[in-house]
C-alpha cells in the first residue's frame, strides 16, 4: 500500500515542471493585466494619440508675460501604442490559456509529448521576443517623450511633475507618467516570466527527449533478449538434424 502511493522520481520531476510553469503562467497573466489597463486608459485620455516618440518644444506664448506653452510638432506613430497594447493583450490571453491547460495536466497527472513540448518551446521563444520588442518600444518611446517635454532636462520640472501641469494639448495628461511607469513594469515583468517559461520549456524538451531515448534503448534491449533464445533454439535444432 505504501509503495503504491509513492511517486517515482520521473513523476515528481514532471509535477515540478508543471507546477513551476503554472505559477509563471499565472504571474505572466497578472503582469499582462497590469500592463494593458494603464495603456488602455492612456489611449482614452490622449484620444487615440500616441505620446511615444512624440516630438515637440516649449515656446513663448506671450512675450510680455513670458508664458511658455508646449507645442507638439509631431505626435508619435499610433502603431507603436497599438503594438504594445496588442502584445500585452496577446500575452494576457496566452498566459491564461496555458495556465488553465497546465493546471489541468497537473491535476490529472498528464504530461506533454515530445512534439507538443517542442511546440510550446517555440511559442515561448516567440512570445519572449515579441514582449521584449514591446517593452523596448515602450521604454525608448516614453524616454523620447520625457526628453521632449523637459527639453532634455533643461526644464525645472521633471517628467513626473509635468503630469500635474495642464500642457494645453487638448488631451488629459494628468496621469501619463504613472500610466506608462506601470505599463513598463507590467511588460518587463511579463517578459521575465516568459523568459523563465522558455527555460522551463527547454528543460522539459530535454527531459522528454532523454526519456524517449531511454524507452528506445529498453525496447532494443528487450528485442535482443527475446532474439537470443530464438537463435539458440534454432541452432540446437540444426545440430540435432
Residue ranges and their predicted role:
Residues 1-69, 104-114, 154-241:
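Intrinsically disordered terminal tails
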Residues 17-30, 77-97, 116-133, 149, ...:
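Physicochemical signature of membrane-embedded alpha-helices that form the seven-helix bundle of GPCRs
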Residues 65-79, 94-108, 134-137:
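Membrane-helix exit/interface motif
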Residues 82-85, 143-144, 237-241:
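A broadly tuned preference for mixed-charge, low-complexity surface segments
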Residues 137-155:
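Functional transmembrane-helix hotspots
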Amino acid at each position: 500500500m505504501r509503495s503504491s502511493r509513492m511517486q517515482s522520481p520521473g513523476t515528481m520531476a514532471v509535477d515540478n515542471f508543471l507546477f513551476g510553469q503554472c505559477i509563471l503562467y499565472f504571474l505572466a497573466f497578472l503582469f499582462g493585466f497590469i500592463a494593458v489597463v494603464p495603456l488602455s486608459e492612456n489611449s482614452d485620455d490622449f484620444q487615440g494619440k500616441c505620446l511615444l516618440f512624440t516630438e515637440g518644444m516649449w515656446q513663448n506664448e506671450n512675450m510680455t508675460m513670458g508664458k511658455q506653452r508646449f507645442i507638439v510638432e509631431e505626435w508619435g506613430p499610433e502603431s507603436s501604442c497599438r503594438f504594445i497594447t496588442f502584445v500585452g493583450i496577446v500575452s494576457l490571453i496566452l498566459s491564461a490559456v496555458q495556465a488553465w491547460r497546465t493546471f489541468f495536466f497537473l491535476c490529472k497527472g498528464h504530461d506533454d509529448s515530445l512534439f507538443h513540448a517542442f511546440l510550446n518551446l517555440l511559442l515561448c521563444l516567440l512570445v519572449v521576443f515579441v514582449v521584449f520588442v514591446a517593452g523596448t518600444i515602450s521604454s525608448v518611446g516614453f524616454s523620447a517623450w520625457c526628453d521632449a517635454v523637459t527639453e532634455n532636462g533643461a526644464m525645472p520640472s521633471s517628467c513626473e511633475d509635468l503630469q500635474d501641469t495642464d500642457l494645453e494639448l487638448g488631451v488629459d495628461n494628468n496621469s501619463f507618467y504613472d500610466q506608462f511607469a506601470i505599463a513598463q513594469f507590467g511588460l518587463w515583468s511579463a517578459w521575465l516570466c516568459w523568459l523563465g517559461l522558455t527555460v522551463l520549456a527547454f528543460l522539459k524538451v530535454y527531459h522528454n527527449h532523454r526519456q524517449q531515448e531511454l524507452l528506445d534503448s529498453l525496447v532494443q534491449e528487450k528485442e535482443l533478449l527475446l532474439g537470443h533464445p530464438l537463435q539458440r533454439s534454432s541452432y540446437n535444432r540444426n545440430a540435432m538434424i
